[in-house]
Amino acid sequence: MLNKFTNKISRYFGLSNEFGVDLKQSEVKKRAIEFLKWESLGDLLPYRTYDSETGLFINQESIGFAFETGLYLGSDDRLENELGGLFKNLLPEGSSIQFLLSGTAKVDHIISNWENGSHGDEILKSLEKKRAKYFRKLAEDGKAKEFRGIVSVSVPVSENNAVVRKKILELKKQVIGTFSTRGGDSRSFDANELIGYLSDILNYDGSIKRRKGEWNEHEMLSKQIVDRDRQYSVAEDEIGIDENNYVMRTLSVSRYPSMWSFGAMSHLIGDSLNDHLKIPSAFFIHLGVYIESGKFKKAGMMAKASRVESQANSPLGKWIPALKREAQEWSFVREQLEKNERLIRSQYQVMIIDKPERIDKTEQLMISLYRSRGWEISRDKYIVLSSLLSMLPMTWGDGMSEDMSYYKKTRRSLSYEPINITPLQGEAKGSSTAGMLLTGRRGQLYYWYPFDKDLGNSNYNVAIVGQSGKGKSVFMEELAASIMRQKGRVYVIDVGRSFEKEVKNFGGQYIEFNAKSKICINPFTNIIPDETGDVKEELSLVKLVIAMMAAPKEGTTDYEDSIIEQGLMEVWQEKGRNADLQDIIDWLLKEGEKDDATKKLGKKLYSYGNDGTYGKYFNGKANINFNADFIVTELGELKGSIQDIAFLVMMLMVQQKVMQGDRSQETGIIIDEAADKLKGKHGADFIEGFIRRVRKNKGALIMGTQNLSDFYSSSGAEAALMNSDWLCCLSQKPEAIALLKKSDKFRISDGQQKLLESVDTKQGEYAEVMIMGSGQAMIGRLILDPYSLILYSTEPSEFNAVQKLCESGMSMEEAVTKVAKERYGSA
């Protein structure tokens, strides 16, 4: 048999026959190599034109279509049944379907979208440029990637007419519909997209930018893919691009694992638990499936099954045990064929592209990755050009399936088998909103933003846990910056100065409580009635604060609560926003002349009256004006119970400001290490009321603790956790993870538990976080540029170095830049 690829080359040189081709010494091969020195690889591609009305590609011997589909994260029976339906029922006999998963550094569009925010803030723009520059370098070094899944179908045709195109168009709708039913994003390729995608592969030059195709409908499609000045050199086992600036190698499977599943395909894009088995280069995984013509092949298989079964049951079977096993296998095949399973031919391939000096190491890494999962793959020799062409979309409909069969690279199986090795597993791609910029463990660059509606959560609240020194504060600071980048507002109530440098760097408002500060946070001053003129909901939270002032440990009784509520309403009716804590105390003492319980309440609040220790904070008109988009209140200098009360009143004032603000503006309210400030029987009521109110105006409570158990240390903290649709876990102790597994709110599987146990932080490189919400769990690595590392650092020497420079007259940005250059050589 003269294979089609050899035939195609032969036609260029007038060679009509070369039966029994010796691929090592073939004159055709020699001339093919010579041909590629002077002609274009595009001359070997089958693409002819594109029908813009139907979205179909008219190829040399087939008609086909291609589309990009969202990649899967794990699997379930429904998914596998949908894929199985493609091979078993939907695709016509003689057609081919190809799956091509690519992992490349073409991430500039992701970085650029993140970099080019519309906020207009110059300081944020400076941070974005520094981070974008850093991530572009990471991508060039193979540490940031994008995984894409391209599916193509091609049907050989003897004629191209409206009837044929109509049938294939209907097939296209059904196939794309199969992938769309799972809620994924499937997008049909047009001519521009096919040209751009194939150009990125065949003109590979290490760029992190995607090429944009520009289709000229008056020229053959295949002529528009390969650059006219691109040169290739074909060796026996690799293809060099432009004098071996980059090298392509293809690898085929020599042994499949005995047990495998569709979900396990995620292990073959890089090991999620071992950085040493992470693929640094561009790579492509291809599965081609050809649907055999049924009746003749099926009859032959049934006959062979009967023959083997007969031999196994003969006296010969007693002496040859392998016959029994073979008979059992063929018996199973016959049963499946009787159930209308189809016969297919398939091929699984891998291609890597890298610099010549790195390609051997990359190849060995790929082989090791597959071997660690029970596969054996090896480099193709003498057919590397055919292998390359056979991986490209729709080429199987133009004879490449026959060529691969001729080279003994395909295997025949039942139609359900390819499901398990379909390369459509990727890494999480997060949200569409350019919030936090993270990478997956295999390098997928993605955004995460808790306010993104497309993620399907019912609220925006976030619970964050991370041991000391594992990056929790940095993660929260970066989340704050992300909210500002989306034109949102951020309120931080802090104890420990974690946010001081950041808020000053961004020109925000820094409010510090200390012995010298003349701050008044009277909760009455900013109360504004709702649309109906009612203030009951506002006063309900003030009531909880006063109750905690009166009885911070034991809590107030129901009777005492009713007294406080009555006093609030009467004082409000008399004085409105001019009321203060002394007015409440006066009312209680006056009413207490008739009731001892009321009198006791008044006395319990003495510390917060005019003559009390803390009276200055709560009497008179509140003088805090929130006049920035980033506001940090530092309570670290306050000690004892006043810190807890100030915390609650600041929460109340933030809520008031959010409710008075623009309902379209997203607001993050960040509190760190504050679980113990929400204790007492009213803690849960306060938090639930707070969350319910701010949610109406796109507000999110973002609460951080060191351990998951901290969320169960007080009723208020537990309420915060139970009302959070997002849980972000940085490095945790095993006992905390065990607690999470028992949680009613966030349930994790055994596999997710194993992932969470592996979450770690490498100082100066990245902090890992497992983000749970919207029905999924994803690992993200927060990687910071040198400037941000210093900006967010709480390491004493770095923190103090910045502080000293600021005290000498430098701006925060200048000080951070100087220290970053000293520590890391750049900023």
Give the residues covered by each predicted segment.
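Extended, folded cores of ATP/NTP-driven motor/assembly subunits in large transport
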Residues: 1-423
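A short helix-turn-beta junction within AAA+ P-loop NTPase domains corresponding to the substrate/partner-engaging
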Residues: 508-511, 716-730
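P-loop NTPase motor domains
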Residues: 77-82, 86-92, 275-277, 292, ...
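Hydrophobic positions on the alpha1 helix immediately C-terminal to the Walker A/P-loop
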Residues: 475
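Conserved lysine of the Walker
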Residues: 472
